[in-house]
Each structure stands twice: as structure tokens, then as C-alpha cells.
UniProtKB/Swiss-Prot annotation:
The keyword Phosphoprotein does not apply. It catalyses: a (3R)-hydroxyacyl-[ACP] = a (2E)-enoyl-[ACP] + H2O. Transmembrane segments: none annotated. Its EC number is 4.2.1.59. Belongs to the thioester dehydratase family. FabZ subfamily. GO terms for molecular function: (3R)-hydroxyacyl-[acyl-carrier-protein] dehydratase activity. InterPro entries: FabA_FabZ, FabZ, HotDog_dom_sf. Pfam families: FabA. The active site is at H60. GO terms for cellular component: cytoplasm; membrane. This is 3-hydroxyacyl-[acyl-carrier-protein] dehydratase FabZ. It is an enzyme of class 4 (lyase).
Length: 154
């Protein structure tokens, strides 16, 4: 996945208050803090600040906290949801964006309190109501996770 950003253009930012209008998730499960840039129908970059106050750290692992990989994947899926809404418009009152499948998930290094996750998700294709994306998560420019995701809006 290579996200190509045109030179001399202002990044498109979406703050958390707007993200909350796009996604139904709330604390403690809203895992996208800010969109730092995107291009409708193509790609999106977002961040998640990992703090020691995350509820998951009470059990994963109290003496040596590591942000769970499944939550990295969930945050990546939420980033695809923001891209889908930014591309296709707001969801209807009774509509949800479902995480349908995941393939080729790989975890490269642990994520710990104090890290800032940067997600890059890219639209691949849409077929019969299922949208396929590829995603990567980075900390300090180093790959921590990658996966192919499928989501459905119903």
C-alpha cells in the first residue's frame, strides 16, 4: 500500500467531535482520536493516542501493559468506517458499519502506553455491499500491524 498525497495541498483533518457523528462507538470503544488526512474513496490516515489510562491495561498486562492487537485491528476497522462515511455520506439512523472479516493480520511489535498509533487504510474494492480495505498501523514510523479488512454497511 502506498498512499500518494498531492504536493501543495492542505491535509483534510477530522476532529473527534466529527468522528463521533460518523461512528456509533463511544468510550471506551471509540479508538480513532483524529483523522490527519484523507482522500474520499481512496485512503485515510488517522491517529490513536495510547495512554496508561486505557481500560484494557487493567488486565492486559498490569505489570507490563501492552495494547491488545485486537484493539489495533478494531481501530483500523473504525478508520475504514470514517473513510466510508466521508466518501458515501452519513449513515441512516438504523444503519451500522460492520467489521465483516479480516485476513493476513500480522503484528510486528508491541504497542505500549505513550505510543501514538498512526493508521493508514486504503480502499481496494467494493462488491455486493462488502468493501475491502488494506490497512497498516505505525508507531514512530515503524510498522506494528498490517491486515486486510472487509466491512459491510447495513
Amino acid at each position: 500500500m502506498t498512499i500518494e498525497v498531492q504536493e501543495n495541498r492542505e491535509p483534510k483533518i477530522i476532529e473527534v467531535t466529527e468522528i463521533m457523528k460518523m461512528l456509533p462507538h463511544r468510550y471506551p470503544f471509540l479508538l480513532v482520536d483524529r483523522v490527519i488526512d484523507f482522500e474520499e474513496g481512496k485512503w485515510l490516515k488517522a491517529i490513536k493516542n495510547v495512554t496508561v489510562n486505557e481500560p484494557c491495561f487493567t488486565g492486559h498486562f498490569p505489570e507490563s501493559p501492552i495494547f491488545p492487537g485486537v484493539l489495533i485491528l478494531e481501530a483500523m476497522a473504525q478508520a475504514t468506517g470514517v473513510l466510508a462515511v466521508a466518501t458515501h455520506g452519513k449513515m441512516a439512523q438504523d444503519e451500522l458499519y460492520y467489521f465483516a472479516a479480516i485476513d493476513n493480520a500480522r503484528f510486528k511489535r508491541p504497542v505500549v502506553p505513550g505510543d501514538q498509533l498512526t493508521f493508514e487504510v486504503e480502499f481496494l474494492k467494493e462488491m455486493r455491499g462488502i468493501t475491502k480495505f488494506t490497512g497498516k498501523a505505525f508507531v514512530d514510523g515503524k510498522l506494528v500491524c498490517e491486515a486486510d479488512l472487509m466491512c459491510a454497511r447495513k
